[in-house]
Amino acid sequence: MVKKCRLVPSILAVIFTLFVVTLSLADRVVIPPSEIGAKAALDNSVRHHEWVKIEVPATDVQLNTFVAYPERKDKAPVVIVVQEVYGLTDWIRAVADRLAGDGFIAIAPDLLSGRGPGGGGTEAFATRDDVVKAVRDLSPPYVVNMLNAVSRYGASLSAATPKFATVGFCWGGAQSFYYATAQPNLNAAVVYYGTSPTQEALVTIRPPVLGLYGEDDARVTITIAPAAKKMKELGKTYITHIYKGAGHGFLRAQQERDGANLEASRQAWPATIEFLRKNLE
């Protein structure tokens, strides 16, 4: 009887271990906060953050850039976070912090650096509408040049591995996809509810692309099928997920659309981390 009783803790330990091992990535990954909780998440983060200025060669631009570091013993791959049409906000910084929590060096540049009033960036504009207009005035070649400077900075970090990816949202999602057509050394691109490049641009794409979309976002989703067809013809990887009932910007606006945005976020973020780890680690 005594021997049988002693087996119980061991059996329970085995059962617990099996339970932990069989948990899906979705059960173990923490999603970023919504826009509402972004500031608090940043204030309470235990990870190392810093602001740096990244010089862009052959220009007078110095990109004001937020960097979040993971807590890990070995070197980490780099993920460039490409802002929404609203510029470099607390929410984009909170996403970078969450990526660091998932093991990546996350770099979020303000692509409006030097283009705001008084030579400032996102924070210098008087209204969000002014920011939106300024972001929409940025040309794809300009953005590629800026992201190339950011990728070089990331590669120069002593704590970084050579592999890097982009994760973009809204306008930044489209830029993330386009950058994959312009930067052959990019290892992966994640597109959150961003439109797809032209058929002609897709011909030069190299890295795998993950696209995450809300079902109720026709302006964006209408561009998925043509891109998917072309990518298949080219033999390139383009994985897409369209989340039922979710709208544009679902990861930022998790509280909207009667839970559909939150459910989409709970599925999309683990898919993002799994994709990044597969292609960067």
Residue ranges and their predicted role:
Residues 10-21:
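Bacterial N-terminal signal peptides
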Residues 31, 36-42, 52-155, 252-254:
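Serine-hydrolase catalytic machinery in alpha/beta-hydrolase-like enzymes
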Residues 158-169:
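Alpha/beta-hydrolase fold nucleophile elbow
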Residues 168-172, 176:
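Gly/Ala-rich beta-loop-alpha elbow adjacent to hydrolase catalytic centers
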Residues 185-195:
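A conserved short beta-strand
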Residues 211-213:
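Short beta-strand/loop motif that positions the catalytic acidic residue
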Residues 216-221:
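Acidic catalytic loop of the alpha/beta-hydrolase fold
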Residues 232, 237-281:
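C-terminal catalytic histidine-bearing segment of alpha/beta-hydrolase fold enzymes
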